[in-house]
Amino acid sequence: MIQTHSEVKRVEELRRLLQQASYAYYVSDAPIMEDAVYDQLYRELQQLEIQHPELVTPDSPTQRIGERPATQFLSVRHNIPLYSLENAFNVEELQAWDQRWRRQVAPTEAEYVAELKIDGSAIALTYQNGILVRGATRGDGVTGEDITQNVRTIRSIPLRLNFDGIEKVEKVEVRGEAFLPLEVFKQINEERQKAGEQLFANPRNAAAGTLRQLDSRIVARRRLDFFAYTLHISGMDDASIANTQWEALELLQKMGFRVNPNHKLCQSLAEVADYYKYWDTERLNLPYMTDGVVLKLNSFKLQEQLGFTQRFPRWAVALKYPAEEAPTRVENIAVNVGRTGALTPLAQMRPVQLAGTTVSRATLHNSDRIAQLDIRIGDTVIVRKAGEIIPEVVRVIKELRPADTQPFIMPTHCPVCGQPVVRETGEAVTRCVNASCPAILKGSIEHWVSRDALDIKGVGEKLVYQLVDKGLVHSVADLYDLTTERLFALERMGEKSAQKLIEAIAQSKNQPWSRVLYGLGIRHVGSVNAQLLSEKYRAVAELSSAKQSDIEGIYGIGAEIAQSVYQWFRINANQSLIERLQAAGLKLANTEEIPVMNNGILKLNGKTFVVTGTLPTLKRDEVKALIQKAGGKVTDSVSKKTDYLVVGEDAGSKLEKAQALGIAQLTETQLLEILEE
């Protein structure tokens, strides 16, 4: 189809509007456009590009997420090496670094730029004539991997630089840190835990692993963020080039990058030391991980004079915070069996205080990790924990190893049911594949009754264990065959308790199809994925008969999830389970229409809510469901992006923060009035 002049102009205008909106939302944290308007403009641009593929450009907002997974990452050589930084661990070592560089040059006054050291993964970005053409991992500093397709999904990285005259610049290279905000990291691990997947040990590992995903759709879902900190420009008039690190940070912001707002220009090492001490405690309140302070000489002229060693720039140093580490003794290595059959080794240790909590257990993940550490019962180990990170064994102090220790070997049979275990090709996890294994059954029932699934009140771990051990339940479908008489066989189960439990189980039949789908515990399917699947396939019959390729085509569903769902419905026992649940009266189809206003827009579309305190009549989950049903979003913490705070009795710090930010507050009654208008 031949494009008209007006269509070309419209495409250019749409790109400009969408790029401005993305910058305002993801970089400036000051939205200028409603989500619904953004979506409408995005769809219009997408449609025009489909009709006129010759108009598609690499910097178009539609090109952030690739259609197909990559098959491999290609090695690329960095134009300018990404050096490591020399480390200092206290103020004395910082002073020693300062004395070393001063011996290299004539006596001079110097300014320092102090920046928080973000605990993520370094990446290098290359722009030609203002357009992003390459993103690469740090690698060994000389050679990295081309991850351009994944870098495009990071919304705080501009696809086109926002700076007058930048399109005439031959090449711009930007370095920075890709990282996972703590709230996002927590959500990802919760999803992985519910889906029976191995948890990420910390946000840094999660960020690095995400950047190396072959499927950019998975990268997009994980919502990486980015702070820029280094700028190299070629082909630009000298007068326009920054002469100091401070000016470079300002220029990066003008170009459209997020720069960490907590950097400081210091006139002395004493100022640097104060900055370091301040953030040693304040960093715990940040929404991302930081493990130190990076100090750079501000003057580029001075940096050029000092140059580099074989490994480090002489003009910069990383002043690290001491890690939360402590030695302790491994008293036992237990092996747990999860609801997906995964065998997870667990180090049981002598209790030790770390990050304000008592740590006595740490996951060892799998047999590969055990072999890597060469950890044994009786070993003295260094265990680490910082903030909300999962406790991990960092290393074994082999000099303190008792003479009679033996290498730990993962069991060849399930420690619960005794059946042989398997380790599939390409997987690090060993699994019990016995569908009747009590551990798998108990885990699947706990998952079924959990808050995000069928939300059956009064069914905790102890009751689940009793139901399985007494032979009353052999699958989740058996819950719907329970009677008060049969429940009397359980310990501490009176008539009133039994009746309440039967009522709670019956009430779960009203839960929507998306929750039932999540409750089935299909591997890799978390609550968000279940929602996506249930929106596409509005009944179980549609999903069970869907082709794997069609499932994979859903935005947000990758190849791994699609394969898992497709294979689950091919198993006869699972088909029988679906039939029993259907016969029991559970909702295996969407029956409600999506509520819309007269103009077709959801009432709360694009609005972000936070709920605090105890509401008069509604539970928090009920409020969340009402808001989401009307197109709104509910988050756990108050920020500049929050539109409304729904306030109940005994509201705490969230109310204070909302008042400080000038965020509107609603009572339960006011919220219901908005929904009923």
UniProtKB/Swiss-Prot annotation:
- Residue numbers binding Zn(2+): C414, C417, C432, C437
Q: Which Pfam families match?
A: BRCT, DNA_ligase_aden, DNA_ligase_OB, DNA_ligase_ZBD, HHH_2, HHH_5, Nlig-Ia
Domain of life of the organism encoding this protein? Bacteria
Q: Does the keyword field hold Ribonucleoprotein?
A: no
Q: Name one GO biological process term.
A: DNA replication
Q: What is its EC number?
A: 6.5.1.2
Enzyme class label: ligase
Q: By its UniProt entry, which CDD domains does this protein fall under?
A: LIGANc
**One cellular component term from this protein's GO annotations in UniProt:** cytosol
Keyword annotations of the record: DNA damage, DNA repair, DNA replication, Ligase, Magnesium, Manganese, Metal-binding, NAD, Zinc
Q: Which residues form the active site?
A: K117 (n6-amp-lysine intermediate)
Q: Which reaction does it catalyse?
A: NAD(+) + (deoxyribonucleotide)n-3'-hydroxyl + 5'-phospho-(deoxyribonucleotide)m = (deoxyribonucleotide)n+m + AMP + beta-nicotinamide D-nucleotide
- List residues binding NAD(+): D35, A36, V37, Y38, D39, S84, L85, E115, R138, E177, K296, K320
Q: Which residues cross the membrane?
A: none
Q: Which cofactor does it need?
A: Mg(2+); Mn(2+)
MF terms from GO for this chain are:
DNA binding; DNA ligase (NAD+) activity; metal ion binding
Looking at the record, the residues that make up the BRCT domain are 599-677
Instruction: Family membership, please give it.
Output: Belongs to the NAD-dependent DNA ligase family. LigA subfamily.
The protein's job, in short, is: DNA ligase that catalyzes the formation of phosphodiester linkages between 5'-phosphoryl and 3'-hydroxyl groups in double-stranded DNA using NAD as a coenzyme and as the energy source for the reaction. It is essential for DNA replication and repair of damaged DNA.
Q: What is this protein called?
A: DNA ligase
**Lineage in the entry?**
Bacteria, Bacillati, Cyanobacteriota, Cyanophyceae, Nostocales
- Encoding gene per record: ligA
